[in-house]
A protein has these predicted regions:
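Short, hydrophobic-biased segments on the C-terminal half of alpha helices
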Residues: 75-79
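A short alpha-helical element within helix-turn-helix/winged-helix DNA-binding domains
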Residues: 55-70, 81
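Short helix-to-turn junction characteristic of helix-turn-helix DNA-binding domains
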Residues: 48-52
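Short alpha-helical segments that sit at the start of domains
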Residues: 15-47
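Short, amphipathic alpha-helical interaction segments positioned at domain boundaries
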Residues: 101-127
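A short, conserved structural fragment
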Residues: 82-94
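General nucleic-acid-binding
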Residues: 1-17
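Minor-groove-contacting beta-hairpin "wing" of winged helix-turn-helix DNA-binding domains
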Residues: 92-103
Length: 127
């Protein structure tokens, strides 16, 4: 095993609200996992992460008022996010997948390990 130099990058960001921090978090998660999410879907994920669920009518109405959306749009986005497993149902409540939930009352530190493996080339001429 070859020894590689470890490179550490530190970026510190402060956000004015849990919702804005959540939008950035879900933008990051979607980018590293190649999941294309619309701006409104990022907002919905952030809102659900903060509130806990989007299942109640009052939660949907609150989201619609905050982000100038409609109940139909929330329903369609929720269905899509459930389909791609970013949202899950827990006891009939729609919530953010547990692996993606973040409590922004605590400081968040992310450790991302990125490595590369060179392509192994084979000589097809001998076959």
């Amino acid at each position: 095993m070859e020894n590689k130099e470890l490179l550490v990058k530190t970026i510190k960001k402060v956000y004015p609200s849990h919702l804005e921090a959540g939008i950035t978090w879900f933008r990051f998660i979607s980018a590293i996992n190649y999941i294309k999410l619309a701006k409104r879907e990022l907002e919905l994920l952030s809102y659900i992460n903060y509130r806990g669920t989007i299942s109640s009518t009052s939660a949907k109405q609150d989201f619609c008022a905050l982000f100038d959306s409609s109940i139909g749009t929330v329903t369609n986005m929720t269905a899509r996010l459930l389909r791609i497993k970013v949202l899950v149902k827990e006891k009939s409540k729609v919530k953010v997948h547990p692996a993606l939930r973040v409590d922004f009352d605590k400081e968040l530190v992310i450790r991302l390990h990125i490595d590369t493996k060179p392509n192994i080339k084979t000589d097809d001429a001998d076959k």
